[in-house]
């Protein structure tokens, strides 16, 4: 069994600072409520058959006014329909979509979370001090298109994989680690929540937990285990994954951190100069996320 890596105290301190600075975070019981319902069964990867342990959606309510009127959420939401979700199908980025990407980056760069992130990265010499340079760097890391399948045209980017989700060869869900996309897709009845994945030594997560492992189907495909932050702002996730991506040139970077009461492993896969995937794992969970 792989030895658990030591806690990264420097990143834990920084990420808690970002958590506290995240004024756009939705709070459980105030800005949203969820219904965990039953514990999901084990489903092998690649299977599209799963017992539904949750007859109702995960999200009972979300403050839609706040979603629409908070700039980082509204600009983020406008990006979610810009992608062809099947890998192997080439993406075409229109001038309007490029403008939407830039509006989103401008919105997140105006937040305290991303200002603190930029300061940290400059101090580490992983980003340039000029904001325009930093924005260009973020654009390349997150929005530059690349190919996930050999011999096919550019069909993916880090943003699409992590925040929107993709399907592979019509039978497997890749990515989709974002609560806003989950909620919006659930509302459209494209996502069917199947139940929570229990953490070891804790038979059931709490409905105010802001990190969950869960099982769901999307457009007919099953995700056996998906790890997801609930309620955090787009800029918070963007910051965490960018920091860990820029730390290392390794194919996979894993950092064990403690954020609030959550002991997590933040995992970032690199696709050359770009983000391949990124997600949190609850370390007390029985199952690692199937990315």
What is the predicted function of each stretch?
Residues 1-257:
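N-terminal "domain-start" segment
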Residues 234-291:
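Compact beta-sheet-dominated globular domain cores
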